Structure formats: structure tokens, C-alpha cells
Regions:
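Terminal cytosolic tails of multi-pass membrane transporters
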Residues: 346-363
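Loop-to-transmembrane alpha-helix initiation sites
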Residues: 181-185, 325-335
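Central hydrophobic cores of alpha-helical transmembrane segments
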Residues: 314-315, 334-335, 359
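Predominantly late transmembrane helices and immediately cytosolic-facing juxtamembrane segments
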Residues: 15-38, 42, 47-53, 62, ...
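Low-complexity, glycine/alanine/valine/leucine- and proline-rich hydrophobic stretches
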Residues: 312-328
Length: 363
């Protein structure tokens, strides 16, 4: 904190510089050291995980193939919204008042998505969800529009503006047309959103993301999702009048699954040192690493709901046919988590090894 002296010559602290409302977006160096996740970024992650919990709430009553089919696309949209903002802020976050405001408004829009998610796939109730998601994407477009002036980044920002902007228009249009045309527009818009980063991959080499900060953001999001799984175990135990052996064993195994995921992902993530993206091949691997977190996150949420259901039913063994479906799905979800984590970590390790070899050759 800066210091000054008063009339008596005593030192006193003074506040730091105020955030200027119109500070332009700036390119965050991929070699920047000491960068940490900000409190706003952590708040942003918490809001998104709360939205995921809201979207997953119907799974507690319909843990079936149909329930999973309905949950997965809605989760994919929330995950895509989180990823879009996270990748942008990793590159261009200026932490000015406008950037903070756009981030907070995105959090509000995601909350609106979650509020409309319960019947989002019904023909009568999907317009509000589509309009909220369109608003999220338009806010992301506004952020990239602010970053268009950054030297060397215009080819990248232009492609993101065109891709995400076109998808946002389709999302808005979908809220105005009836089903089933509305859902076909969803598919087209989501495909454009997913394809945009891949079409800009060669330009991302010139404007690489911070290869230390972005893994930290993904790691924190994964950690908060794991925390929600632990909350599910607690809710399952809370529903019991006492602690019957079956419920206690199920809760212990559920906590063990969460701990196994944590160990597998974070111990490996810490072992693999992050390196900047220098070539197109490394940029592609970095994109694959990022997208590998989708099955990882999806599996954590689905297995967490499954563990809660098993703990709740274990006391009386009143599992039923739907409950019998819970156990294999939970196991498959856990395997998806572990495979996603393994893919993510192996790609990161290969990037690190390639960067180390290149450094040795240069030296």
C-alpha cells in the first residue's frame, strides 16, 4: 500500500489508484509472473457452479437416461459460457470498471439461464433460456469488441467477434421462433460457438493465453464442483434419521470418489509444469486440454448426484429400478472424469516436455 506523510511528519497509508471507467483492454503477457486468480474471478466461478447446481436439480428426481439427456445440453451451455469468459479474461482482462461491470452482468444473465433451465427444453418455456444465453454471448462479444485495438490481436478478436456475434444473433432469433425450429437454431448456434476457437487457433499462437493462469482457473472450477459433490453426500446423510451402516458405507465411498478425483487431477496438474503456447501444434493441444474438462466437469456433477441418491436409499435398500440405473451411470461418470483428467494432464505434460526440449535446443 502507498504511504505519505501528514503535517506532523507521520506516515499514513493512502488508497491506491482508482479504477478508471474507460481503461482499454490490454493483452496479458503469457510470460507474466505472479498472476493470481482475482476475487471477482472466484466470485464468477461460484455463481456458475451455483447455476450448475440449479440446472442439475431435476436429476435428483429423474436420474434416468431421459433425465441425463435433458441435463447434458443445458450443462454444456453453462460450461461454454464459463469457458468463453474465462479464456477472454485470461488474455485481455484489464480489471477496469467496465470489465468488472460486464462480468457482473454476465453473472446475472447466467442466473437468469439457471432460473429458466427447469423447463428449458419444453416448447413453451425455452424462449427465456435462449434469450438469457443470447445476452451472455452478446456481453462476451462486447468484451472482444473492447479488445479489438490491441496490437497483434485484431485477427484473433475479429474471428471471435464474427463467430460469437453470429451465434448470439441465432440464439436471440431462436427465442422468437416456435419449436422445433427454435431447437434447430440452438444446434446451429452452439456448433458455431464451439467451432470459433478452432478456426482462430493459428492466431492464438501470436496471442497465447497465460498457460499458468488458465489451468488455475480450470482447477478452481473443478475444485468447486468437487465441493458440490461433497455437499451432496452431506445432504444424503442429513436425510437419514440415524447413521445406518449402508448409508455410512455409501457416504464413505462417495467421499472416496471425490478424493480420488482430486488426487488424480490436482496431483498430476501440480506435477506438470505449465508452459506458454509457442506453436500451432501446442495451441491445438491446449484447446484439446481445455475441452477435455467438459467430460471431467460433467462426470463430477452426474456422479455427485448419483452418490447422493445411493446414500439416501442405502438405509432401506429402497433403490428400485431407477436407483439400479444410478450405480452404473455413476461409475461411468466417474470413469469419464478420470479419463478426462488423464487426457488433460497427459496433454499438459506433453506440452511441458516439448517446451523443455525446445529450450534445451535453443540454449
Amino acid at each position: 500500500m502507498p504511504w505519505s506523510r501528514d503535517r506532523r511528519g507521520l506516515r499514513r497509508s493512502v488508497p491506491g489508484p482508482m479504477k478508471t471507467p474507460a481503461a482499454p483492454s490490454r493483452l496479458r503477457s503469457a510470460h507474466e509472473t505472479g498472476r493470481k486468480v482475482t476475487w471477482l474471478e472466484l466470485f464468477f466461478d461460484l455463481v456458475f457452479v451455483a447455476a450448475v447446481a440449479q440446472v442439475a436439480s431435476p436429476l435428483h428426481g429423474d436420474y434416468s437416461p431421459a433425465g441425463l439427456v435433458r441435463f447434458t445440453p443445458l450443462f454444456a451451455l453453462i460450461w461454454s459460457a464459463w469457458t468463453g469468459h474465462t479464456v477472454f479474461s485470461t488474455r485481455f482482462d484489464s480489471d477496469d470498471v467496465i470489465q468488472r461491470t460486464l462480468t457482473l452482468v454476465q453473472m446475472f444473465a447466467v442466473a437468469a439461464m439457471a432460473a429458466n433451465a427447469k423447463d428449458a427444453l419444453d416448447t413453451r418455456s425455452s424462449a427465456g433460456f435462449a434469450a438469457a444465453y443470447a445476452f451472455v454471448r452478446f456481453l462476451l462479444v462486447a468484451q472482444y469488441f473492447r479488445a479489438r485495438h490491441v496490437p497483434g490481436a485484431r485477427p484473433l478478436t475479429t474471428r471471435y467477434l464474427v463467430g460469437h456475434g453470429g451465434a448470439a444473433v441465432l440464439w436471440l432469433m431462436s427465442s422468437l421462433v416456435p419449436a422445433p425450429a427454435r431447437f434447430w437454431l440452438w444446434v446451429l448456434a452452439f456448433a458455431i460457438d464451439l467451432g470459433t476457437p478452432w478456426l482462430a487457433v493459428r492466431h492464438s499462437v501470436k496471442v497465447p493465453p497465460d498457460a499458468a493462469h488458465l489451468p488455475e482457473r480450470f482447477g478452481l472450477f473443478t475444485l468447486i464442483l468437487l465441493g458440490e459433490s461433497v455437499v451432496g453426500v452431506m445432504r444424503g446423510m442429513e436425510s437419514q434419521e440415524d447413521w445406518p451402516p449402508g448409508a455410512a458405507v455409501s457416504a464413505f465411498l462417495g467421499m472416496g470418489i471425490a478424493f480420488l478425483i482430486w488426487w488424480w487431477y490436482f496431483d498430476g496438474a501440480r506435477a506438470a509444469s505449465e508452459q506458454p503456447v509457442r506453436t500451432k501444434r501446442e495451441a491445438i493441444r491446449f484447446h484439446v486440454w481445455s475441452y477435455a474438462h467438459f467430460p471431467l466437469s460433467l462426470g463430477i456433477v452426474v456422479s455427485g448426484v448419483g452418490v447422493e441418491r445411493i446414500v439416501t436409499a442405502a438405509a432401506t435398500l429402497a433403490i428400485g429400478l431407477t436407483g439400479l440405473f444410478t450405480m452404473p451411470v455413476m461409475l461411468v461418470a466417474t470413469l469419464a472424469v478420470l479419463c478426462g483428467a488423464q487426457l488433460a494432464l497427459s496433454l499438459r505434460a506433453r506440452m511441458s516436455a516439448a517446451a523443455a526440449a525446445a529450450a534445451v535446443m535453443v540454449s
